């Protein structure tokens, strides 16, 4: 560009005047920034420390299939093509929008532009394609959730086209978790077990497996910068130590905590306890195998009438509400099915009376220690009838897992925590050994859906069918608990057992302690 030399004197004066004005503005802006940077109460310097009960052993989510790795790193260090909100609804992630073809075989995602990884490399559609291909090649945990991929391509820098051999109505859901993480294709040789190269609002500042994970704000993040400078997770294996650390100020927050811990800390000065929704479902599971009493439809239904599921839900401190079916309130296809089997001991007694004394004798209720109390309640409720009696066995986790695998049980108390996990009842080889032709067809129909509306409607029909047939007794959905200092804000409260986005977590500087050591 050429510059005119006319009115050169005025140009010089204009230049000096402009410099003076600019310097003055910089002084004002700098003074304001310094005040905001250092004044007590500013979030810019806040360090928030969070207590958790499990820590990943590796930062590589592809090789560490633990829930902890995904919960702490996704949305914080790594970003996914699609994400979910606090109501478990799909929301734009790295992909600002997507479109599914009418036949359900092509999904086109449009990516944000101007995104970089924490190492400065540009993130574009080629990285997304490479990441998806790596998931398949390396058989990453849950890779089957991607469905039958025919091809993955990037026609340009901001477009990803996924072609399927057959419809997968939950593909976008899969892309909101570990399978949807976009990695840097130019850093394929990096040691991801100890190093994280993501595009999220935080970077990993330090990682001590089994002890701590420190996240630092990424100043190059493409979105709204994290509210806190540092977020550090500390592992506590003892609930009493965790509670003490919260009350003495060694921790600013703990999530998720048990119902008993939340109850014990409720009302403590300087702390607040919040509840949130989950997809965690607690059920009295039935062994429907041919050698089990529960292979008989009449027996299954009698147990459902006999068990006071609503009463159990109202009494359990971690219960958000009675359930009645395999799909929770936050999952596609939910319907309130609690009215199918209202508590009716007279009805149960009549149904049990059809069985001879030598057939209806004793059922084995096998549980791990965590469900001892609930199992004792269930045993008492069943034994209000003359038959059957209940042989309750509380086992170690190892022995329990073996008994379930060997199929030597009739009843057990367990939880299922996953969106779209109801399909397990369509698998006759699952632990439930539930073999129902109509249910299998209903689930296959749902999986063949080419749009969300059809999928939800068909899942609702499937859920009603297996609940009416009493494949198990779904007791209640769980709620989760967060305990935090009253000086901390902006943290999530729902779904925190699955993911914990912390870009908005904020604390008042001067109220949150600067720490070099932690009470264990």
Where on the chain are the PLM-derived regions?
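Extracytoplasmic/peripheral linker and loop segments enriched in polar/acidic and small residues
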Residues: 2-3, 7, 18-22, 35, ...
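N-terminal lobe/hinge region of extracytoplasmic solute-binding protein
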Residues: 51-102, 133, 197
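Gly/Pro-rich hinge or "lid" segments in bacterial periplasmic/extracellular proteins
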Residues: 68, 173-225, 230, 240, ...
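Surface-exposed binding/hinge segments that line
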Residues: 144-185, 206
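Ligand-site clamp/hinge motif
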Residues: 219-264
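Periplasmic-binding protein-like
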Residues: 290-331, 374, 466-471
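Structural transition elements
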Residues: 318-355, 372-373
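Long beta-strand-rich cores associated with HINT superfamily self-processing modules
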Residues: 482-520
């Amino acid at each position: 560009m050429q510059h005119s030399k006319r009115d050169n004197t005025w140009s010089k004066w204009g230049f000096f005047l402009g410099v003076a004005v600019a310097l003055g503005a910089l002084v004002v802006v700098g003074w304001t920034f310094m005040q905001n940077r250092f004044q007590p109460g500013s979030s810019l310097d806040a360090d928030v420390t969070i207590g958790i009960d499990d820590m990943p052993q590796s930062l590589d989510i592809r090789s560490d299939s633990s829930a902890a790795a995904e919960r702490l790193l996704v949305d914080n260090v790594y970003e996914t093509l699609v994400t979910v909100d606090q109501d478990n609804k799909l929301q734009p992630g790295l992909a600002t929008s997507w479109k599914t073809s009418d036949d359900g075989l092509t999904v086109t995602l449009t990516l944000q532009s101007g995104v970089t990884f924490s190492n400065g490399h540009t993130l574009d559609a080629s990285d997304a394609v490479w990441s998806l291909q790596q998931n398949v090649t390396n058989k990453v945990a849950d890779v089957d959730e991607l469905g039958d991929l025919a091809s993955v391509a990037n026609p340009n820098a901001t477009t990803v086209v996924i072609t399927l051999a057959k419809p997968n109505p939950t593909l976008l859901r899969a892309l909101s978790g570990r399978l949807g993480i976009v990695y840097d294709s130019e850093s394929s040789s990096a040691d991801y077990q100890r190093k994280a190269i993501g595009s999220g609002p935080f970077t990993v500042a330090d990682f001590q497996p089994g002890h701590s994970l420190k996240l630092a704000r990424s100043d190059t993040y493409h979105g709204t910068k994290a509210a806190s400078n540092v977020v550090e997770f500390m592992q506590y294996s003892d609930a009493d130590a965790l509670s003490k650390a919260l009350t003495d100020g060694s921790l600013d927050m703990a999530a998720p905590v048990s119902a008993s811990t939340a109850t014990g800390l409720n009302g403590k000065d300087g702390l607040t306890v919040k509840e949130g929704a989950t997809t965690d479902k607690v059920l009295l599971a039935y062994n429907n195998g041919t050698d089990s009493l529960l292979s008989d439809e009449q027996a299954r239904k009698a147990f459902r009438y006999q068990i006071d599921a609503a009463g159990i839900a109202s009494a359990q401190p971690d219960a958000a509400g009675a359930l009645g079916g395999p799909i929770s309130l936050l999952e596609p296809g939910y319907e309130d099915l609690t009215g199918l089997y209202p508590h009716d001991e007279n009805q149960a007694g009549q149904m049990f009376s059809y069985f001879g004394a030598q057939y209806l004798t004793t059922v084995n209720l096998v549980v791990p220690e965590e469900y001892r109390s609930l199992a004792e309640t269930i045993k008492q409720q069943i034994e209000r009838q003359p038959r059957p009696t209940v042989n309750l066995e509380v086992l170690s986790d190892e022995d329990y897992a073996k008994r379930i695998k060997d199929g030597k049980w009739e009843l057990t108390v367990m939880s299922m925590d996953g969106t779209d996990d109801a399909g397990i009842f369509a698998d006759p080889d699952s632990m439930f050994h539930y073999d129902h032709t109509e249910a299998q067809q209903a689930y296959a129909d749902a999986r063949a859906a080419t749009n969300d509306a059809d999928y939800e409607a068909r899942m609702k029909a499937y859920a009603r069918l297996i609940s009416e047939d009493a494949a198990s007794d779904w007791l209640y959905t769980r709620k989760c608990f967060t305990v935090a200092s009253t000086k901390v804000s902006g943290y999530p409260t729902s779904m925190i057992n699955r993911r914990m986005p912390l870009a908005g977590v904020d604390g008042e500087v001067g109220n949150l302690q600067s720490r070099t050591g932690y009470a264990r």
